[in-house]
């Protein structure tokens, strides 16, 4: 009985693993990608990050028809200190971070270079904003994948902390905590803040060359009870999709994808002549032919900065086709 039970468990585990692999492959295929990198092996240097982030931002400026695009600013830690009584606590000082109140933060990442680590290859590191001598605020927490033979770069989201400095809170630095780490891991060889910031008042912007906020041709009108086919807003945040490989996307963290929904009454906003004919035939015989449906009629690509799937130390700027809905029609 016991042997049969464990055999069933082993079989179920094997089938589940196959299902996960197939799901990942399907996700790659649906996006038209050849591969995703192994996130446990990603190790992008600060020089490579800075170079390719600026290339990505330049690409955005060209594709967005001069709509506001942030600038990249980097600040190295001036001080790295260790808590005298707690070996698993390290403090980073960034007193040189100077920004005016007119600036606006898009994204702020703390990137640290940590030494090789044998004891626990995947410890959990917590990042805190220091508010006072006794108060801390958690900014980010993640499992990092270290190497037993080489130093590795790790990245953390500290946007809310840097934004609070911009709004007048005292800049007392950032604290790293890792109960599973030893001193060598929490003594970063290098620590850098990489900040995407709007240095001038930003104009209307979205991640496309179209200015939706001023009203697209098929954008939905707020307050309409029974909306006809129109474009609704839909913000997609990549980390919320719960697909491990998608964490290799560096930028954008999120984007406005949009979707189509609404009624398609007779002779309303047809996408093609075929949809007009289908609408007429449906009116004659509703059982034989379905009503036309609200669907995207114009799509746009998305510029993406992500880890090279074949060289985990490099970044690529890519254009992913058909990622954003621009207009909707009955089809």
Language model features with spans:
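Eukaryotic basic, amphipathic alpha-helical target segments in cytosolic regions
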Residues: 19, 64, 116-118, 135, ...
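Intrinsically disordered regulatory linkers and targeting segments
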Residues: 14-61, 198-242, 252
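Cysteine-clustered segments with highest specificity for TGF-beta superfamily mature ligands
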Residues: 110-112, 135-219, 278-317
């Amino acid at each position: 009985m016991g042997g049969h039970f464990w055999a069933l468990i082993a079989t179920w585990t094997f089938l589940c693993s196959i299902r996960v692999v197939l799901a990942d492959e399907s996700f790659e295929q649906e996006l038209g990608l050849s591969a995703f990198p192994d996130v446990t092996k990603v190790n992008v240097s600060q020089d490579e990050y800075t170079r390719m982030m600026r290339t990505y931002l330049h690409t955005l400026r060209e594709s967005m028809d001069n709509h506001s695009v942030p600038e990249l600013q980097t600040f190295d830690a001036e001080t790295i200190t260790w808590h005298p009584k707690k070996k698993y606590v390290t403090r980073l000082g960034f007193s040189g971070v100077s920004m005016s109140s007119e600036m606006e933060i898009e994204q702020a990442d703390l990137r640290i270079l940590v030494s090789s680590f044998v004891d626990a290859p995947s410890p959990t590191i917590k990042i805190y904003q220091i508010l006072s001598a006794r108060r801390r605020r958690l900014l980010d927490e993640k499992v990092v994948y270290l190497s037993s033979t080489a130093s590795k770069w790790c990245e953390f989201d500290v946007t809310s902390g840097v934004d609070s400095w911009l709004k007048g809170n005292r800049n007392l630095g950032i604290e790293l905590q890792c109960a599973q780490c030893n001193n060598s891991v929490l003594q970063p060889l290098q620590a850098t803040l990489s900040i995407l910031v709007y240095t001038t008042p930003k104009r209307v912007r979205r991640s496309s060359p179209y200015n939706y906020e001023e009203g697209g041709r098929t954008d939905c009108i707020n307050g309409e009870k029974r909306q006809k086919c129109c474009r609704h807003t839909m913000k997609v945040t990549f980390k919320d999709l719960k697909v491990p490989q998608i964490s290799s996307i560096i930028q954008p963290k999120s984007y406005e994808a949009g979707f189509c929904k609404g009624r398609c009454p007779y002779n309303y906003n047809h996408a093609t002549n075929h949809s007009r004919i289908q609408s007429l035939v449906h009116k004659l015989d509703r059982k034989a032919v379905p009503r036309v449906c609200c669907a995207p009629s114009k799509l746009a690509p998305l510029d993406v900065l992500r880890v090279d799937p074949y060289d985990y130390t490099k970044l690529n700027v890519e254009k992913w086709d058909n990622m954003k809905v621009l207009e909707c029609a009955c089809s």
